[in-house]
Amino acid sequence: NKRGLPISCFLNEANDSLNGIVDLWTENVWLAARGGGIGSYWGNLRSIGESVGGVGKTSGIVPFIKVMDSLTLAISQGSLRRGSAAVYLPIDHPEIEEFIEIRRPTGGDPNRKALNLHHGILISDSFMRAVEDDDQWDLRSPKDQTVQKTVSARSLWIRLLTARVETGEPYLVFKDRVNNLRPEQQKLAGLEIKTSNLCSEITLPTGTDHHGKERTAVCCLSSVNIEKFYEWENDKNFIPDIMRFLDNVIQDFIDNAPDTMETAAYSAMRERSVGLGAVSYTHLTLPTNHPV
């Protein structure tokens, strides 16, 4: 089957221009067509009502996210494996209040909803301190950092938590903590982590890198069955062999990715990111009555 690819985890971002938005849509269409799970960052875009080209006003991020919602659904319906996507926004973006409610099926304009996308919010340490102190919180233009609106940090936090209780989302990504824990080589290269993926477990740099090239982050994920731990615990090559296999999968993606995934193949080549997790821990502990 030539339709699928060995990688299904991608992270990208939209630039603050019509070309940048259309490029993101186009890339996401091709990723979804191959069954990709996508996490897209929209925090670079100016908010609704900000000036464009000195004469017009931007319509904000929500209409563009709505188009991404429709594109993902349309492409997924024709695929063997459904592609899915998540969208991310920082907590200081001027449209954050509407963004929190974007998956809520009731209330507001149905044309400004994205019910088929998942969504997440990048939380900063300064915002959490403002919540703790019950301070005001400035919502700033991504273009020039001018204050567009000021809200109660605690009220915004309560609104966010209410949405999570009632709808299960948005995801929360504590971006300062994530960036503090970046590998040293990423810090030295000035690579910033702005977003996460469809399931919010991957944190990799996206956008323009220190070489002036665009990155669509790629990660190859797998897991080991901990229930079978005693079958391989003394095999010193077990984990290294798995990691080598995952790196081979990355190479297969690099070798076979189509031109429409050029930025993803470039990112995979530069980073070769892999992740190995574990499943069935409870099944390991229950027979021996060990506490979980």
Model-based region annotation:
Residues 96-104:
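Short active-site loop/helix that positions an aromatic residue
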Residues 1-53, 61-64, 75-78, 164-273, ...:
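Function-dense linear segments that define catalytic or interfacial modules
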Residues 282-288:
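Conserved small/polar residues in nucleotide/adenosyl-binding loops
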Residues 101, 121-158, 165:
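Polar, glycine-rich mid-to-C-terminal structural blocks
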